[in-house]
Each structure stands twice: as C-alpha cells, then as structure tokens.
C-alpha cells in the first residue's frame, strides 16, 4: 500500500508555513515528527550507526525533509540523516529482503504493510521496553507496527448545493436522485470498498471480510456520477474547491483546509468515516541497528510533539495523552477524539494485509475501464 497521505501531509505543512499559519519553529517540529526524526534526544543516548536512513516517497520533499529535520537532527546527535525518496513500495521492500541487502532503517508504511511483512518474519519486533504501551491507542501495542498518527477518509460536500439537508452517509453518497451532482472517490481503494458495502446495506459490524465483488458492483453503478478517482490530496481539494465535484470521500486533513479556505462552503463529517493509521516499521538487518530504530520510534510518542503535528496538519495523535493538550477550539477536528472514534469505522488492517494486492488489482481495473 502506498502512503500517499504522508506525502500529502508535507505538502500541507509547506503550504501553511508559506502562508504564515505556523511558525518556523513549529514547522521544523512538525516535519521532524512526521518522519520520526526527533529534534532532541537525551544527551547520553548512544548510537551505533554512522547514519540513519529514512525511506519516504520522494520528489521535492527530499530537499524539504533535509532542510526541515535532517540538519537539526544531525546537529543534535552527530548522526547524518539520509533520506531515500525512491518510495517504500512493497516490491522494493521485498527486493531488499530477498537480496539480504537492507538499506533502510525506518520506513513509513501503512499498518497493513507492516503486518504483512511481520508475518513473513521480515521485521524487527518492536521493543516495548523502550516504547510505552500507555502511549498508543487501544489495540495498537502490536508486535511489528505502531502508529505514528491517524487520519480518516471523510465525506465532504458543497453546502451551497445541499443546504440544510446534506449527504452524511455512504447511503446518501450513492443516492444520486436525492443528492444530485458529481462525486469523487479515492483512487487507491482504502475505505471505498467499505463505503460501497455500507451503501448496499451491509452493517458496519459485518463488513469484514469484505465482499469485494459486491463492493465493486456497487461502485460500478455509481461510475457515471464519478467525475474522477483522485490520486493526491491536492487533486481532491481542487475538485471540490472549483465545484467540479459536489461531494467526495477525501482525507480529513484536506477537508479541514477546504472548509477554512471556502469560508465554510465545503463541509464534512466524521459520521461513518473510515479511520486509518500510518505506522512505523523496521526491517531485520537495518544498517543502524534495531536499537537505534527503536529509540527513534519511541521518541515520536511524546504527546507535546504530536500536538505540534496535529496543529500543523490535522493528523490524529497516536498517543491518547495528546488529546487533552489540543486547544479546545480545535478538538472537533481530531479524528481520534472519543466523539469522532464513536461514529467512525476502523479499517481492518489485518484484512488489508492479507487481501490488499488482489483487491486493488480488481479495483483499479474497474476504475480505469
């Protein structure tokens, strides 16, 4: 699974910094946490490696990551940070494992990727003597993956079109008679099969294992009313901003920006949204050593740092202790607040770990037809 959301987070961060919405200091803090590079570590922390290699999704973000967090980290620890922007695709990870040539120390990945490679015996187990189980969401003190932050696929809509009776559920999203207008959905499938099945009458508690053929058939019914399957956060935002789409399933971070930038014209809801974690993994045989990787991952659990990331990007904190530190006027934007979690649906990462590739192939064949 490709972590397009992590790429999008940095685009949002750069945009907010350029607009003066966040200070340079908070920009550096947020960028550092985003890729699990702490700005400060204990002065007596020992490192066995000459460098730490982080793998992300590349492009212009390589230089931005270096400026934002690589230099401060090197100044704090003496360890150079190398950012590999070639992209941690499942194929690239598998190639390193097969060749026994591991070049990445910390990898940003969706949780299902970590679960899948953990089952294959390819990952270092997390060292919970360094990490705190009290600083993760319930059920996420797992063997091979732990969240860095959370995000949601939410239903956003144009309130000028729908007024006081807007679409608020997957059933409404599929009801083109009651809610006319073009739609947009996520190109890489996450949450879209679930939305289709709920619209087709499946109860959220009965979603898994997903009935992929049934979900695809439901999406095919809606295709004439889908203007685009978006592949980037910027694309999803543009479609709604310019009125090409009347509604869409998009990331909550982009929905929040849209609401602000349109003066509330674009609204959105956590009701029956789909909650997903971004997670850290470490391959066995990583050059810097597992202890160093665990020190980095443990450092990202600090609640104050996670609030910096929330305020910069809108990502839900992985550490529940951070919720109380979020300014009161922003808590309604937190996708992992108790109120938001109560009305959302957790994407089943274990199902995705076992079925993602096969299901995605069928999904892409449908959307590209």
Residue locations for each model-derived region?
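N-terminal secretory signal peptides
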Residues: 1-26, 33
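A ligand-binding cleft/hinge motif common to bilobed small-molecule-binding domains
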Residues: 114-118, 241, 247-264
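Conserved C-terminal helix/tail region of periplasmic/extracytoplasmic solute-binding proteins
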Residues: 13, 18, 339-369
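Mature extracytoplasmic/periplasmic domains
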Residues: 283-344
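Extracytoplasmic ligand-binding site segments that recognize negatively charged/polar headgroups
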Residues: 59-66, 102-241
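Early extracytoplasmic/lumenal segment of secretory-pathway proteins
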Residues: 49-116
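A bilobed periplasmic-binding-protein/Venus flytrap-type ligand-binding module shared by bacterial periplasmic
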Residues: 154-161, 197-202, 277-290, 297, ...
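Periplasmic-binding protein-like
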Residues: 151, 213-222, 260-284
């Amino acid at each position: 699974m490709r972590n397009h959301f992590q790429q999008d987070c940095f685009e949002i961060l750069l945009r907010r910094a350029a607009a003066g919405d966040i200070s340079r200091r908070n920009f550096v803090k947020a960028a550092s946490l985003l890729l699990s590079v702490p700005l400060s570590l204990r002065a007596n922390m020992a490192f066995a490696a000459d460098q730490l290699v982080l793998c992300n999704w590349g492009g212009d973000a390589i230089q931005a990551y270096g400026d934002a967090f690589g230099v401060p980290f090197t100044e704090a620890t003496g360890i150079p940070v190398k950012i590999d922007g070639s992209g941690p695709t499942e194929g690239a990870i598998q190639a390193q494992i097969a060749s026994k040539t591991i070049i990445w120390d910390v990898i940003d990945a969706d949780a299902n990727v970590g679960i899948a490679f953990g089952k294959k015996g390819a990952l270092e187990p997390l060292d919970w003597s360094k990490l705190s189980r009290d600083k993760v969401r319930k059920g996420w003190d797992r063997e091979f993956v732990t969240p860095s932050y959370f995000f949601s696929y939410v239903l956003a809509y144009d309130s000028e079109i729908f007024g006081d009776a807007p679409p608020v559920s997957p059933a409404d999203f599929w009801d083109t008679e009651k809610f006319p207008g073009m739609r947009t959905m996520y190109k890489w499938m996450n949450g879209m099969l679930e939305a289709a099945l709920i619209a087709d009458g499946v109860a959220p508690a009965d979603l898994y294992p997903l009935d992929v053929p049934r979900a695809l058939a439901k999406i095919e019914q809606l295709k004439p009313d889908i203007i685009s399957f978006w592949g980037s956060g910027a694309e999803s935002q543009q479609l709604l901003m310019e009125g090409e789409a009347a509604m869409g399933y998009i990331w909550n971070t982009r929905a929040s920006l849209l609401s602000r930038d349109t003066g509330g014209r674009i609204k959105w809801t956590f009701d029956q949204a789909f909650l997903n974690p971004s997670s850290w993994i470490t391959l066995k045989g990583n050059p810097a050593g597992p202890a160093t990787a665990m020190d980095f991952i443990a450092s990202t659990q600090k609640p104050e740092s996670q609030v910096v990331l929330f305020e910069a990007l809108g990502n839900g904190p992985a550490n529940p202790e951070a919720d109380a530190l979020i300014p009161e006027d922003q808590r309604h934007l937190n996708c992992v607040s108790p109120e938001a979690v109560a009305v959302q649906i957790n994407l089943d990462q274990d199902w995705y770990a076992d079925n993602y590739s096969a299901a995605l192939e069928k999904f892409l064949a449908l959307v590209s037809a």
